[in-house]
C-alpha cells in the first residue's frame, strides 16, 4: 500500500502591495517557530522516508560507490611566489584542508602553516574565508566563520614563531589585500544587512578599534570588494551590483595614500581592470558593447574619455576575463557556447588561442601568484574528462600536465561519450545541449535521461566532469544539460532574452531541449528526470505545469518558486 502524502491545510492570508490585494493560503508555513509548521515538515519527512524505503539498499550502494571514487589524501598544484611554493592538501579521513608551503624546491621539507582540522576540533561548523600570506612571507591572514552566518573573524598568524597576533577583527567578509610593507592590510566589513560596504586599513600590532575607514559605499544596491592587481603593484577597490561597477586603485607601496577613481559609475556600465606597465587594460560594455570589448588607457589618465580600443567589440564573442603578465595579456572568451583562452604578446600584438580537441568541454584560467612569468596555468575538463591542470608556455605554446584529477575505482574515460547538440526553440532559435552517456547505452529511445537546467542571472552551466554522475551513466542513464536562455552561453543577449518579460523563453527552451532529445531517440517521453536548483527550481516548477507528460520525475533543489513573496520579504 502506497503511503499518502501530507496535505498542508489552507489558511488564507491577505497581503497588500501598491494597492493590490493577494491571498496566500500557505503564508503560515513561513513561521519556523509554529508547532504546526514543525509537525507538517516532520510529516513530509516521514512520507519521504516511507516512499524511499524500498530503495535504501540501493542508496547505500550508491553512496559507497561514489565515495570509493574519491581520493581523500589529495592536494592542490603548488603555486610559486617568491622563494616559496604554496598549496593545500587533505589527509585521509580529514574534513578540512591544511595550508602548506615548501621553501625554494618542491622536494624541500613541508611547512604546515595552518591546519584547519586542528581548529575545527570540538566545533560543529567551521568555514575559511580568506587565507593570504604577507608579501614578506612572515604572516598569514586567515578568517573563520564558526556558525554559518558568513561573518568572518580575521586572525593574523606569525609564521616564524607560530604565534597568533593579538588582533581579532569581527564581521569581516571575503576580501583582504596586504600592502607591500607586510605591516598594513585592507579588509571589508559587513553591515546589519550582510552587505560588505566598508573598507578599513589595519596596521599590525595596533588595536582594530582604531583602524582607519578608507571607504564606505552609501548606495544600498552595491557591494564592495578588494583585489590585488595582476602585477602586484596595486590594491583594487571595486563596487559592484545591479549591472553597474566602479573601480579605484591604490599603490601598495603607499598604503597611507587615497584610492584613485578610474571611471565613475553609471547605470548599465560594467567594467573591470588589470594593469601592465603604464597602462590599464579594461574590459567594458561601454558604447553598446554588450559582449564586452577591451580598451586601454594610461594609469595617469584612466577615465573613459581617454579609452582606446584594444580589442574591438565582436557580437557573439563574449569577453569574460583579463589576466596580465609581464609580456602577455590573456583574454578569456566564450564563443558559440564554448570557452576559449586567447594569449596576446604585448610587444607585437600577436595572438594565439589555446587549442582544445573535444566537441564539448570547459576550461578556465587560474590566476597565479607571479607576474614576471611566461607560464599560464589553466584547468581543462569535459563531461568525460576529469579536471586536468596544465602549465602552458606562452612563448613556445608547449604545455605540461601538472595534475590529473584522480578518480579511483575502475574509471576509464574511453567508456563514455560526450556530444553537443542543438534543439530548435519555439521561436526558431537554436538551443545548445551538452550530453554524455556510457558507450554501451542504446540510443534507440529506451534510455532514461537526466536533464539539468538553470537559465538565470547570466550564469552559464559548464560541460564539466562529475565523479558522482558515473554511477547513473554506468546504469544506462544519459545526462544532458539544457543551455537555456537566461544564462550567458551564447553571449549577453542570451541572458537578456531569458529574463523579465522574456522569461518564458527559459521555460520554452527547456521543453524544446526535452522534445529534441525524444525526437533524436536519446530517450522517450515520460523517461526524463528533470533537475535543477534555486532559480532552476523555478524553471522546473513551470515546465512541470506546462508539459508534465514529458517527465517521469522532478528533483528541484531549494526551488525559488514563491518569487513575489520572497522578493517583497
For the regions a language model picked out, list residue spans one by one.
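Serine-hydrolase catalytic core recognition
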Residues: 7, 76-79, 83, 263, ...
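Beta-propeller folds
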Residues: 1-375, 379-387, 391-396, 412, ...
